[in-house]
Amino acid sequence: MTEPAAFIEYRAVEKAFGGQPVLRDMSLAIQRGEVMFIIGTSGVGKSVTIKLLIGLIRIDGGEIWFDGRRVDQLAERALVPLRKRIGMVFQASTLFDSMTLAENVALPLRKHRHLAGPAALDEARRRLAQVYMAEHAERYPAELSDGMRKRAAIARTLALDPEVVLFDEPTTGLDPVSARRIDRLIRELASGLGVTAIVVSHDPPSIFGIADRVALLYQGGVRAVATPADLRASADPVVQQFITGQSSGPMETPGF
């Protein structure tokens, strides 16, 4: 059976900072509607990989394709419609403390959909309901837990109905209960709304709980791409060291 054409594809991507290579000949294909986790040690280029897709960082070589179109060469103005189709939830929730959650979520609706105040707020409340935060719409970020702020940030990202959502370590710093709630939301986005989710994570319960496939970055490239079950069963010593957390082995972490 022929595998469908990739929705998102990195082709032999190269990226360096200050002359230090981070990604070298990195290739990865992601299918529409799947939950793809990108894992690896600190400094291996996981967050760089997702930022390259929307042009927050530019590649040095190779190609990046999205929905049948090459996007790595797009000018800044041409990236605007791309970024409406691809949302990103940053590690920090980046909410405005002076605004209620509803006002925060309404911002992209006013800017990009030109909704008037009441209409934007009504839609914002609907988006907050999608992440189980409807009753907190009139509260301020400082009044909420980290997990609740993270869910509000996801609601804001969903406001423009993106086809893809990039998550940069969405459960970092959260307690286990809040982390699993975020996992459930990510899974619901894919299964209920058909969103393609690309998740950078170090969190084993997330990785093995909700991923369709997992890509392990190592030495600038993709060492393995597999389902969680196949990753656990891998005989590759690099894969086994990462998933078991052993300090000794072929993997090295910069600074240790």
Residue ranges and their predicted role:
Residues 54:
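Helix-to-loop junction immediately C-terminal to a conserved catalytic motif
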Residues 69-70, 117-136:
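Conserved ABC ATPase "signature" region
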Residues 140-144, 148:
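Conserved ABC ATPase signature
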Residues 159-163:
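A short, proline-enriched helix->beta-strand linker immediately N-terminal to the Walker B motif
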